[in-house]
Amino acid sequence: LRTIRAGALASLVESGHPFASLVNVAADYDGSPLLLLSRLAAHTLNLERDPRCSVLLSQGGKGDPLAHPRLTIVGSAARTEAEHVRSRFLRRHPKSELYAGFADFSFWRITVERAHLNGGFARAADFSGEAVLTPLDGAEALLAAESGAIEHMNADHREALSLYATRLLGERDGPWRATGFDPEGMDLSAGDRTARLTFDKMVATPGDLRSTLVHLATRARALAHSPAQD
């Protein structure tokens, strides 16, 4: 939900038949899928008529595609003009800024009603929307500070971001940048690659976030200098 950059959006045509299309996906603070759609596209016309939809997000990988995890989100889509939605989407998909301002494009948010997780053969389960989303109660100060925190980390702490990705998450080295903060973790990207750093405990304020990031950076540096990592 936090790391997949594109998915299959299923909307409904007038006859009631499902219509699947490939779309870029980002995540709101709570994990709700965010989309940037052209009103000229068939799926947008479908959503304007009937907001019910689903999005399939697949991790993919080598071998049998059905052996890898995938998540289906079921809900309703609605246009949104929230500035943070635009910022979050474009940090995940910076090339989309080329057309995000076109008159026929708008941002959409899917209200999650339920989810179906399939972790591979014989490993499937259904969840309520509440179960898969991040609770935001009491985190208003953190969310308000997100843009500033991201700008600060990307400008002044690129080494720490690289250490988070490579030492704590096992990712390959690259130009890692922060793209989002929420009470449960931090989203990172390096080109087309994405990663999710989950915090040890929920954070609710900028102070909580700073303390957590300092602690994680200390842990990552320790791993970087340990004999096992050399």
Predicted regions and their residues:
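Short, structured beta-strand-loop surface elements
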Residues: L40-F105, T111-R114, T194
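An N-terminal domain-cap segment
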Residues: L1-E48, S54-L56
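C-terminal edge-of-domain segments
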Residues: L98-D230
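A short beta-turn/loop motif at secondary-structure boundaries
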Residues: S15-H17, G63, G180
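Short beta-strand segments
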Residues: P18-S21, L71-I73, A125, R193-L197
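Coil-to-beta-strand transition motifs
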Residues: Y29-P33, H68-R70, D192
